[in-house]
Amino acid sequence: MSDASSTILFEYPLNEKTRTWLRIESLLQQLHQNHSLTDMGSALTFFRAIAELLDVLERGDVRTELLKELERQQQKLLQWSDVPGVDMERIHTLRRQLKDLASTLMAAPRMGQFLREDRLIGMVRQRLGIPGGCCSFDLPTLHSWLHQPQELREKLVSGWLSSLSPLKQALDMILELIRHSGIFRPQISLNGFFQDNASDADLLRLRLEQAHQLYPQISGHKTRYAIRFLPLDSENGHIPPRLTFELACC
């Protein structure tokens, strides 16, 4: 297959915990990409991501699931100890990192609590559900805050992001290990359809040539999955009888 610059990477979670983690990862990325808050547009993107992140964190015990996964990844690494030729120093380093992340996560306050208690975040969060509800006459506090010196705003935003560090660091490590647990292999779909067993996997990763102008519609769970390729142009698009793509089951 061509180089990565000419392909699109799609990811699909095969269980609810991975679905939640990918959503949290996406929201954390939005926060870090828009943390400068130089105008109202970037500010609303930032605060909307915070509001959605808090909503996700309130739906389940994210900390417990992450701690379980950190322990599971440690046990998986331990199994590699018996494999001849394995880099034991690398194994020990990763296990030590996982233990440190678990300790930090265990000692951290309730996920998102620092953000929930912030007055400005609370005010903006209340108005985000109203279409156009963050105008200057609705939120004069935010309007005034955005005209504060940049260094003052950066200091406050830095504190917000720092409060999420235990969550972000643990999640980044877990998702990195999950993603690297699968190897991309070439596959062929017939008339736009492909299915296979998932072997108790957590995540599907699919690479597809941009030139095909197709996207995958994926359904599945931890034991089996199905992929149907559909054209971006639903009226004039073409699905080749045999389509080559790359798939990693992680």
UniProtKB/Swiss-Prot annotation:
Q: Which GO terms describe its biological process?
A: division septum assembly; FtsZ-dependent cytokinesis
One Gene Ontology cellular component term attached to this UniProt record is: cell division site
Q: Which Pfam families match?
A: ZapD
Q: Which InterPro entries does the entry link to?
A: ZapD (IPR009777), ZapD_C (IPR027462), ZapD_sf (IPR036268)
Cell compartments where the protein resides: Cytoplasm
Cytoplasm as UniProt keyword? yes
**Alphabetically ordered keywords of this record:** Cell cycle, Cell division, Cytoplasm, Septation
Top-level taxon of the source organism: Bacteria
Does this UniProt record's set of keywords contain Transport?
no
Q: Which PANTHER family does the UniProt entry name for this protein?
A: CELL DIVISION PROTEIN ZAPD (PTHR39455:SF1)
Family membership = Belongs to the ZapD family.
Quaternary assembly: Interacts with FtsZ.
As for what it does, the entry says:
Cell division factor that enhances FtsZ-ring assembly. Directly interacts with FtsZ and promotes bundling of FtsZ protofilaments, with a reduction in FtsZ GTPase activity.
Q: What is this protein called?
A: Cell division protein ZapD
Per the UniProt record, the source organism is Pectobacterium carotovorum subsp. carotovorum (strain PC1)
